[in-house]
Amino acid sequence: MSAGMSAQLAQAERAALCDLLLDVGPDAPTLCEGWTAAHMAAHLVLRERRLDVGLGLVLPGPFARHAARATERAAGQVPFERLVARIRSGPPRLIRLVDGPMNIVEFFVHLEDVRRATDDWTPRTGLDDLQDALWPFQKSGTKLRTRRVKDVELWIARPGGEPMAVRTGGRQVTAIGDPGELTMFFFGRRDQSRVELTGDPDVVAEVRSAPIGF
């Protein structure tokens, strides 16, 4: 898929998330523990516009604490509609060239974080292009987020597709699902994703409960 198509899909997810945020309001729950829709909006604004906060999203300790404080402050002090308007305006000029690879997964996940924070959610349909765009990120992203899963040979597959190895060695398990569902599962939203795990029952249980993330 071209970079231009990837960027278009990222922009579509951005717009859909902005519409949803305004629809549910700042106090709506999300799948991110402790975060309301206002925290989500603040996070997305700061992530693209504040390098000091961006570092805290990948580095632990004081960096992470600084990012958490900045997010809490923005969520509480900046009007919600203004935060959403900043998100909708798109990324700053310096990062527009990497909008697709930088943002397509981010905005898909956070849109679903808001959508799936209710008991009656269902997967979106008609997302073939988006699913195709998310698939190339699965191997590297899943490998990174499962680095603390030990002694497991992990494969992933789309429904009806050929499995792809993510981690080799150890006891084998295969995760099967649409790329969007695999994304949600390995971003830690396991209870709010539709992924089938096949393999030894003990290994399947391990993958379902093992720590996942950065």
Regions found by a protein language model. Give the residues of each.
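Short, charged, amphipathic alpha-helices and their helix-cap/turn boundaries
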Residues: 10-19, 75-86
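Generic alpha-helical scaffold signal
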Residues: 11, 31-34, 74-77, 101-104
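An N-terminal domain-cap segment
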Residues: 2-56
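Short, structural beta-strand-to-alpha-helix junction motif
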Residues: 36-37, 79, 178
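Structured surface interface patches that mediate subunit assembly and partner/cofactor docking
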Residues: 2-7, 24-27, 50-66, 82, ...
